[in-house]
């Protein structure tokens, strides 16, 4: 084996390559993700220590009044352990995993990616980065449609650091809506929602920002920011009955719009 080929491969030139192909591009939390990791040998035989997959995103942290973005691993697992790949040889490793229920929806500034790490012994590791589209879980989709029917439009969505929630991940995804028509346009400035999904149902955290109305409203907003925070849990049956769901959401908003 050429000394220079060895040297080049250790520097990543002519080394094995990795490419991960997913069965499809879009998934929703709780759905099974299937795909295959393709590895092709380079110009020399190489020992592969392992192949790992990570599901990752970025979230906002505020430090010294400045916003920064930090990576977070949503899920990770080992696809395979050690093996040797010969020059030009091809290997395929199928995999399956369930998209975690707390995976953020890819809307607004939120991105989610499957990152493949090919660990090469004595060489530079290779990686593959595949963005995926994460759709809303059907229960959350029903809530979003109901909120839209009540006259709200999604203005912004992002993942923000939230250690006080004591969740598995260091962040929560926040959805910011603005009223565009109807009663709430006169009563509210904005509505922020956080969805905490599990197998049995959905907890929604509402942050309602009331519009200041006259001197009393202005003074109230000055002292407590005009915001009201409420947590409500919905069962599976409540989330699947779209008419009842919209009525319940309207009742909640009416309490805090007055």
Curated annotation (Swiss-Prot):
Q: Cite the PANTHER family for this sequence.
A: SPORULATION-CONTROL PROTEIN SPO0M
Q: Where is the signal peptide?
A: none
Set out the biological process GO terms recorded for this chain's protein: sporulation resulting in formation of a cellular spore
According to its UniProt entry, this protein's organism is Bacillus subtilis (strain 168)
Q: What is the lineage of its organism?
A: Bacteria, Bacillati, Bacillota, Bacilli, Bacillales
Keyword annotations = Sporulation
Pfam families recorded for this chain? Answer: Spo0M
Reply yes or no: does the keyword Chloroplast apply. Answer: no
The UniProt induction remark is: Expression controlled by a sigma-H-regulated promoter which needs the sigma-H factor for the binding of the RNA polymerase and subsequent transcription.
Gene3D superfamilies, alphabetized: 2.60.40.640
Looking up InterPro entries in the UniProt record yields: Arrestin-like_C (IPR014752), Ig_E-set (IPR014756), Spore_0_M (IPR009776)
The name of this protein is Sporulation-control protein spo0M
Say which family it is in: Belongs to the spo0M family.
**What biological function has been recorded for the protein in this entry?**
Controls the expression of spo0A and is required to pass the morphological stage 0 of sporulation.
* Organism domain of life: Bacteria
């Amino acid at each position: 084996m050429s000394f220079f080929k060895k040297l080049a491969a250790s520097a990543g030139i002519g080394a094995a390559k990795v490419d991960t192909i997913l069965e499809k591009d879009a998934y929703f939390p709780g759905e099974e993700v299937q795909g295959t990791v393709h590895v092709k040998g380079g110009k020399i035989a190489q020992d592969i220590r392992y192949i790992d997959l990570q599901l990752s995103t970025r979230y906002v942290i505020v430090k010294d009044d400045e916003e920064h973005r930090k990576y977070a691993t949503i899920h990770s697992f080992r696809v395979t352990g050690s093996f040797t790949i010969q020059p030009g040889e091809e290997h395929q490793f199928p995999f399956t995993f369930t998209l975690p229920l707390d995976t953020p929806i890819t809307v607004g500034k939120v991105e989610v990616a499957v990152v493949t790490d090919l660990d090469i012994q004595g060489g530079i590791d290779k990686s593959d980065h595949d963005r995926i589209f994460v759709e809303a879980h059907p229960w959350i989709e029903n809530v979003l449609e109901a909120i839209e029917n009540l006259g709200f439009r999604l203005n912004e969505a992002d993942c923000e650091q939230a250690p006080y929630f004591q969740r598995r991940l260091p962040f929560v995804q926040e959805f910011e809506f603005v009223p565009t028509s109807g009663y709430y346009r006169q009563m509210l400035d904005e509505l922020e929602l956080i969805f905490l999904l599990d197998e049995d149902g959905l907890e929604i955290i509402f942050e309602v920002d009331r519009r200041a109305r006259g001197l009393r409203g202005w003074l109230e907003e000055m002292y407590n920011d005009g915001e009201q925070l409420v947590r409500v849990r919905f069962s599976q049956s409540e989330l699947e009955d779209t008419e009842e769901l919209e009525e319940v959401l309207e009742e909640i908003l009416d309490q805090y719009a007055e």
